[in-house]
Amino acid sequence: MNEVLAKGIKAKEVARELVLKTTDQKNEALAAIANQLIVETAYILEENKRDIEEGKEKGFSDSLLDRLLLNEQRIVDMTEGIKQLIELRDPIGECVSAWERPNGLSIQEMRVPLGVVGMIYEARPNVTVDAATICLKTGNAVILRGSSSAIHSNKAIVSVIHRALKQTSLPSESVQLIEDTTRDSAKQLFTLNEYLDVLIPRGGKQLIDTVVREASVPVLETGAGNCHIFIDETADKQMAFNIIINAKTQRPSVCNAIETIVLHENWAEQYGSELFSSLKERGVELRGDNKAVAIDTSILLATEEDWETEFLSLTLAVKVVATVEEAIHHINTYGSMHSEAIITENEENVSKFFTSVDAAALYHNASTRFTDGSEFGFGAEIGISTQKLHVRGPMGLPALTSTKYVIRGNGQIRS
């Protein structure tokens, strides 16, 4: 029996145990994991160092190495996230709605775990902790399949989680890692319908598109972040500068960083040159259309591919438009339905933008960097969904649940 199938069978078995665990039991397990991560920090960092060294040998970009890197502070941040997760209300067992029918039947809609969650992701070893702990909090078994670039880190983290769970009432197999990082193991996970209730891809556009195209199991799509900010002609100059610099340069390798700015031509004529200089001073490489290049001849001429690309680095595309309608058309054509923003003092244009732009999160006069479970007040998140079914936007605890109906009667039969 191959690894993926064996772990699928075990996960299904464990899921039936997890549904019986109380909130206190689950929280005790989470606390044990947080403690064990601190106790074994040196071991985790030693294994992470192996991934970093191998990544450098393979010529990984600085942005990819940053996503791969763990240090003491990042592990502390993981444990703080787990502590916050413990404090969140457990959604399992809550009554979503209840009513009584004229025939006396009492109907309740109850929140329940999804069952077995598959998680396939790239680079970031912190996702291993996030996915494992969020699934445990919601009573789900989880099968993790990270990338080869983070295999040493992921194996170390999961072994630490197993040692923590063995101190609690939760089965250690509640969290399992597929150690085979070949394409074959991924394909097997895509079709594990008998054992997997949902598969969540988290990574770049190529990974997500592959999962959506090839998986026969249900998929919760966490889309790539080809995010835009439109600077309307009435936008406040300093506000626009602050928001764009934050949304691009604070952490360019994340999915809610912007990849394109769309400038109204009247605003660009006044402030474009200064904005471009400010961005270049911060190491940003600009690629613009003809109108942008006319403002600053040092800007590279953008290609069609640039409008479509999630750079995840200090590269930014620039589009200059004549109207809000033209901006909306560009964003809807090239955006990934993740996070889009408008900076303007014109409420009519805000209304047009919010009504017409198709994305999970829309902003007025704020950075797209806020599309995040903790920033939304959800606490933990397992990803940001860009699809429309089941859940959209940051996926907090309720996103990893389903519902079932519980009907109580006193002998009713249907006539």
Swiss-Prot record:
Entry EC no(s): 1.2.1.41
GO molecular function, one term: glutamate-5-semialdehyde dehydrogenase activity
A GO CC term attached to the entry: cytoplasm
Pfam families xref list: Aldedh
Protein localization: Cytoplasm
PROSITE patterns recorded: PROA
Coiled coil: none
Family: Belongs to the gamma-glutamyl phosphate reductase family.
Its job: Catalyzes the NADPH-dependent reduction of L-glutamate 5-phosphate into L-glutamate 5-semialdehyde and phosphate. The product spontaneously undergoes cyclization to form 1-pyrroline-5-carboxylate.
PANTHER family: DELTA-1-PYRROLINE-5-CARBOXYLATE SYNTHASE, GLUTAMATE SEMIALDEHYDE DEHYDROGENASE
Protein name: Gamma-glutamyl phosphate reductase
Organism: Bacillus cereus (strain G9842)
